[in-house]
Swiss-Prot record:
Its main location: membrane. Coiled coil: none annotated. This is Neuropeptide Y receptor type 6. GO terms for molecular function: neuropeptide binding; neuropeptide Y receptor activity. A lipid is attached at C336 (S-palmitoyl cysteine).
Length: 371
């Protein structure tokens, strides 16, 4: 979603775009321990997000060769966009927040903000497509059923829409040293320091775009998914009641309860992970004076970190709580371990062979000439 651009991951003007944001710069520094813990947390989320989503994509790719599955196609797209979020949001945001300046150049200033917004949009719209697919599967099983081709078309459309939606960010971001010009600290220390911020023709344009973006990247998808999953839960509850009256198949009733829990968890987790960051962004856009304090950057980083946790939780809900995916994951890990052991064994065998050949060569070289 819209990430406040205190960092490149944000889709908004940073507090650094105004030199007054540095009023506390000389006397206020984030605690070293807090920054260290933040860096460790970012690293853990980055590793878990990439590994979890790569595992899902690998498993789905193998299963897709056996049979085309709409749900798996959409989950793979979600995982791909989540990987982009991990790669393009977490490292740049962490470094920018810790260093308090932008070090990656003007091109990356524009590109990272653009790619981050695109990947975040794709992740959220992928969740919407999954909600639609599950709604049709459970609530309206006799109606229109999305096919694999429909899934691919849907994926193409959300990528195209996300690319177009984020173009204003590509055009508005630039580098500036303005926040460092009026510091009372030695100017030599900050002579080459710059920040990556948005620049709009007017505050009205910036507010209009940022508000529209946060609506499209958070509130509208959340409301849509809430309605879809609410109808799904109601539908499953009615089926559970029928099963109770007929005293049929208790295992099916248990499975439906598990699905209910998972669906509710999906919506709650999505809303909870992104709520702090979007709240921060709304406050910054409309009441930014409230945020001009010592720990502004630290508060932003914590909110951003919580949002990034969603990239780790999505594989959990959409894959690892699925029994079939659990089995496939075990098989994947087994194959990886076996491959590693086989490679090691072959290397040892080749090394031994070379050693034996060397010894043989030495023995031949020392055979007396008269024999």
């Amino acid at each position: 979603m819209e990430v406040s651009l205190n960092d490149p991951a944000s889709n908004k003007t940073s507090a650094k775009s105004n030199s007054s944001a540095f009023f506390y710069f000389e006397s206020c520094q984030s605690p070293s321990l807090a920054l260290l813990l933040l860096l460790i947390a970012y690293t853990v989320v980055l590793i878990m997000g990439i590994c979890g989503n790569l595992s899902l994509i690998t498993i789905i790719f193998k299963k897709q060769r056996e049979a085309q599955n709409v749900t798996n196609i959409l989950i793979a797209n979600l995982s791909l966009s989540d990987i982009l979020v991990c790669v393009m949001c977490i490292p740049f945001t962490a470094i920018y927040t810790l260093m308090d300046r932008w070090i990656f150049g003007n091109t990356m200033c524009k590109l990272t903000s653009y790619v981050q917004s695109v990947s975040i949009s794709v992740s959220i719209f992928s969740l919407v497509l999954i909600a639609i697919e599950r709604y049709q599967l459970i609530v309206n099983p006799r109606g229109w059923k999305p096919s694999a081709s429909h899934a691919y078309w849907g994926i193409m459309l959300i990528w195209l829409f996300s690319l177009l939606l984020s173009i204003p960010l590509l055009l508005s971001y630039h580098l500036t040293d303005e926040p460092f010009r009026n510091l009372s600290l030695p100017t030599d220390l900050y002579s080459h320091h710059v920040v990556c911020v948005e620049h709009w023709p007017s505050k009205t344009n910036q507010l209009l775009y940022s508000t529209s973006l946060i609506m499209l990247q958070y509130f509208v998808p959340l409301g849509f998914m809430f309605i879809c999953y609410l109808k799904i839960v109601i539908c499953l509850h009615k089926r559970n009641s029928k099963i109770d009256r007929r005293r049929e198949n208790e295992s099916r009733l248990t499975e439906n309860k598990r699905i209910n829990t998972m669906l509710i968890s999906i919506v709650v987790t999505f809303a909870a992970c992104w709520l702090p960051l979007n709240t921060f962004n709304v406050i910054f856009d409309w009441y930014h004076e409230v945020l001009m304090s010592c720990h502004h950057d630290l508060v932003f980083a914590i909110c951003h970190l919580v949002a990034m946790v969603s990239t780790c939780i999505n594989p959990l809900f959409y894959g690892f709580l699925n029994r079939n995916f659990q089995k496939d994951l075990v098989v994947l890990i087994h194959h990886c371990l076996c491959f590693a052991l086989r490679e090691r064994y072959e290397n040892i065998a080749i090394s031994t062979l070379h050693t034996d050949e060397s010894k043989g060569s030495l023995r031949v070289a020392h055979i007396p000439a008269g024999i």
